[in-house]
């Protein structure tokens, strides 16, 4: 099955770099849970497509991608990854980070270990593969997980009474003063080119 990102390390490095930029310590197990959530929610949003070519297994600690785990076992690996991932995927990962990036390890364990995909694979034995279809079904049903719309919906700003408001980027506009009442306008009008003027 085709994946939309070249390798799972691209996504792992994205999370690691984002955590570093925000002075957030990213535990190796937390990285594993974020990768699992990223793959599962992406499959829901894109009709079963993979975000990254990754295989998750049901470890006793929680869902884990063994290649990423081995790669990060002694710190950040020195490998070449894509410097820039596609804009749509960057936006998706940003939404996911906003929702789960600052969550505690306990909360992420509760969410991921509570999915039927993890439970079914774990019941078959340690380190059993968690299929993408099982992950997608778990996240579609939103069992012990936030619904996909809660994860990727755009942020809505509200007033203190709870009414939604539309927020636009602020653009500084230079206002021209009321010409009839402006001292500056009168001053400029009274000066002619080349003559000395004193402000009243």
Spell out what each predicted region is.
Residues 1-200:
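Domain-edge interaction signal
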